[in-house]
């Protein structure tokens, strides 16, 4: 679906409604769990999130899609130029019309988008990470940025100024928590996709962590599941869950109409870690996923948490 044009003008005119519908279809097709969460949002916010998701997906496809072998640093530079065009109000592709409209409705900053492109540059130049600090930077760029983009759309809760003790209270903007949720999701993706990435010669788990458990790159590339691997995965899952816990702390600061979908998305994605454990950490031969019935059961619990937490 990704098309890069050197033309400064959109080749195929699209209406806003058509563009948003295209973004909806792409989100529903490629991010089923995420899409379920967006269905709980007010219309304007869900449309904006679809537009952001599609841009992020197209960006990711540059280095992780069917045409990735032809992507160069120059390709990413050109993609960033197209981003600047979109922020200037000039869409290039039909799906960009929705993003341009979103930029007019919500206070989105261009920097997280640029940071995401920087994350794709990292993917072009390396396939190993020595330390968690290195991996954490990568996770911020490719996923923590999504938290920041989404936060601008979701909005924050305003204190009830009719209550005297709230009159001096400032609005809390849960930036760190939004980043934490993006990082938690990316760490979950990495753990779920270890086998798939290994088949492409990529290892995202920090090499320092592998060494800590006496587990080698060769072991990972060969899909070796033993007690060393299980201990390593327990360590990684515990780390990811800490980021989810941090993210939870910011949900109460969000606008009330967005808390239920955010709780839903967080809880559903975190359950992937439970499924990895249920599969006895074999991410080489089994892809962890949350069954539909579990997703449905999650909805009322997420709604309850949104109301009381």
From Swiss-Prot:
Pathway the protein acts in: Carotenoid biosynthesis; phytoene biosynthesis; all-trans-phytoene from geranylgeranyl diphosphate: step 1/1
Task: List the catalysed reactions.
Answer: 2 (2E,6E,10E)-geranylgeranyl diphosphate = 15-cis-phytoene + 2 diphosphate
Q: Supply the InterPro entries for this chain.
A: Isoprenoid_synthase_dom_sf, PhytoSynCyanob, Squ/phyt_synthse, Squalene/phytoene_synthase_CS, Trans_IPPS_bact-type, Trans_IPPS_HH
Decide whether keyword Transferase is in the record.
yes
Q: Which domain of life is it from?
A: Bacteria
Q: Matching PROSITE patterns, A to Z?
A: SQUALEN_PHYTOEN_SYN_1, SQUALEN_PHYTOEN_SYN_2
Q: Where is the signal peptide?
A: none
The protein's GO terms of the molecular function aspect are: geranylgeranyl diphosphate synthase activity; squalene synthase [NAD(P)H] activity
The enzyme's E.C. designation? 2.5.1.32
Please name the top-level EC class of this enzyme: transferase
| Alphabetized NCBIfam families for the sequence | PhytoSynCyanob
| Protein name in UniProt | Phytoene synthase
